[in-house]
């Protein structure tokens, strides 16, 4: 197993596809779009850079939770990069995917209900 661990922060770019394998395990696969950002010193504004699309695979219980994600959800994925070979147009290709160990939904860009320290709902907040 390749132990190149990485953290990917981005948006889910395809709805997850989940399937149960013959041995009973669940596997969920989806893609994440991660866009770099740089601060333009002259204008003081953030500018989007290149977008990288990565396949993410989750297994077992994490796969069942990842199946609830939807296109556009902001996620933070921690996992290992895995290289694999596959056949395409009569030849062999190399692909890469992130084998997820943890997946978190980024709440800063999502409408969420928050709770005060007393447990009462404090309202909703939306950030972009």
Model-derived segments and spans:
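Single-stranded nucleic acid-binding surfaces, predominantly the OB-fold ssDNA-binding core
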Residues: 1-128
């Amino acid at each position: 197993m390749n132990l190149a661990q990485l953290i990917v922060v981005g948006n889910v770019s395809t709805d997850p596809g989940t399937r149960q394998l013959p041995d009973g395990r669940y596997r969920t696969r989806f893609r994440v779009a991660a866009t770099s950002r740089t601060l333009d010193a002259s204008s003081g504004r953030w500018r989007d850079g290149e977008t990288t699309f990565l396949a993410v695979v989750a297994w077992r219980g994490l796969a069942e939770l990842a199946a609830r994600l939807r296109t556009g959800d902001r996620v933070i994925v921690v996992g290992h990069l895995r290289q694999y070979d596959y056949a395409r147009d009569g030849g062999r290709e190399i692909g890469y995917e992130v084998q997820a160990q943890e997946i978190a939904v980024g709440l800063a860009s999502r409408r969420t209900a928050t709770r005060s320290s007393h447990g009462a709902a404090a309202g909703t907040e939306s950030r972009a």
